[in-house]
Amino acid sequence: MEYEPVIGLEVHAQLLTESKIFCGCSTKFGAAPNSHTCPVCLGMPGVLPVLNKKVVEFGMKMALATHCRINEECSFARKNYFYPDLPKGYQISQYAYPLAEFGYVDIEVEDGKKRIGLTRIHMEEDAGKLIHDPHNPSSYVDLNRTGVPLIEIVSEPDMRSAEEAAAYLRRLHEILVYLEICDGNMEEGSFRCDANVSLRPRGESEFGTRTELKNMNSFRNVQRALEYEIKRQQYILEGGGSVVQETRLWDDSQGVTHPMRSKEEAHDYRYFPDPDLVAVKISADWVEAVLREQPELPLEKRERFVRDYGIPPYDAGVLSSSRPLADYYEEVARQSGNPKAASNWVMGDLLRFLNEEKREIRDCPISAASLGELIRLIDQGTISGKMAKEIIEEMYRTGKTAPAVVEEKGMVQITDEAALSGVITGILEANPNQLAQYRSGRDKLFGYFVGQVMKATRGKANPQVINDLLKKMLAG
């Protein structure tokens, strides 16, 4: 029997607000343990939470970017469970009345695009962090993360392979980072994913028993964990067994999943409305104000780059992979007036330099205006492409502009026809045998004469001018 995987993802994105969702404590990562806490996020008696407006607006940004319906009214609920990193004994989340519902994102698959539905986007607070001591049985609790704002993005079970799930996750990550509402750092836990996966006979509409996968801290691990879990469930079903509904942890070092606990249902958490927080009313004017601040999203930008700049889809995908890189490329294209050359130089030499030093485009020592100026010098014939390779290295190393490097190194290309004619005449007179052979039909010697001219001018002669003059002068 052939089985079909059914996959849904729950993504938690930590929002880039300066303060927590219900108090004024800092959200900055890496501070001393328990230094960013107060009576509100520690769950002390007699204190009341106050909702951070920016959290709602960041959630609305993601909802708009993923074509969700933003509800006119949403409210918070208490999710009750015990864990050492949850000081109140409950987590403030949303349940019956989330921020937004019924959205979608499109992903690229082998045969085109596929639409993945979003069930909901809701706001909630993060829990603290347990730190386990490897040298003794103690565990320590750091509550700095308690109350840090999250949005949870819940997909429909629309994915049918681990590859589709990884593509969907990358698309969400790309949108969140483009919107500048989440830094997307999976290692620090600001972008986390849980996966629900089940198998069913191909062609059936009823879902199988699902397992939830946790502890996946990279796109690669999400794909590997799902691939393993699909094979594990298939082995069980083909052997006549039954899949147990449970939560499993991914073990990256062994490449397997391990049972963690039985899978909870919503009723296990005893959700009820939080009496300390009023409902949030979202007006059409508020939605419109947030919409006006939305940037162009990566998929739209990619399509525009192909359409308006005439660059290949692959190049457009690389150049729009991050908002700062896309902005840099567009400025180079504007400054140079040559979008295709701008694409080649940014994707080629510039990204190579940055990748070698593990630097971001924001830290690039060559400004977009300077790179555009370099491309203009090539297009004007002032320097050759070969010269430009040497010049851009010097620009990257020193931060100097292209004209400054050209002047300093005396690298201006020779385009004066009279001067080059004199050089060519001397070379032809010094090579009578090669000249005679060329004129008798050995056309390949043309390259020899080009090389001699470049050697005589130390590579400064304009190749196009040389070619034109040589053709005339060799013809006799």
Swiss-Prot record:
Coiled coil: none
Listed EC numbers: 6.3.5.-
Keyword Transcription appears in the UniProt entry: no
Enzyme class name: ligase
Catalytic reaction list: L-glutamyl-tRNA(Gln) + L-glutamine + ATP + H2O = L-glutaminyl-tRNA(Gln) + L-glutamate + ADP + phosphate + H(+); L-aspartyl-tRNA(Asn) + L-glutamine + ATP + H2O = L-asparaginyl-tRNA(Asn) + L-glutamate + ADP + phosphate + 2 H(+)
Protein's GO biological process: glutaminyl-tRNAGln biosynthesis via transamidation; translation
Single Gene Ontology MF annotation: asparaginyl-tRNA synthase (glutamine-hydrolyzing) activity
Entry keyword set: ATP-binding, Ligase, Nucleotide-binding, Protein biosynthesis
Family designation: Belongs to the GatB/GatE family. GatB subfamily.
Subunit structure and binding partners: Heterotrimer of A, B and C subunits.
Biological role: Allows the formation of correctly charged Asn-tRNA(Asn) or Gln-tRNA(Gln) through the transamidation of misacylated Asp-tRNA(Asn) or Glu-tRNA(Gln) in organisms which lack either or both of asparaginyl-tRNA or glutaminyl-tRNA synthetases. The reaction takes place in the presence of glutamine and ATP through an activated phospho-Asp-tRNA(Asn) or phospho-Glu-tRNA(Gln).
Protein name: Aspartyl/glutamyl-tRNA(Asn/Gln) amidotransferase subunit B 2
Originating organism: Syntrophus aciditrophicus (strain SB)
Gene that encodes it: gatB2
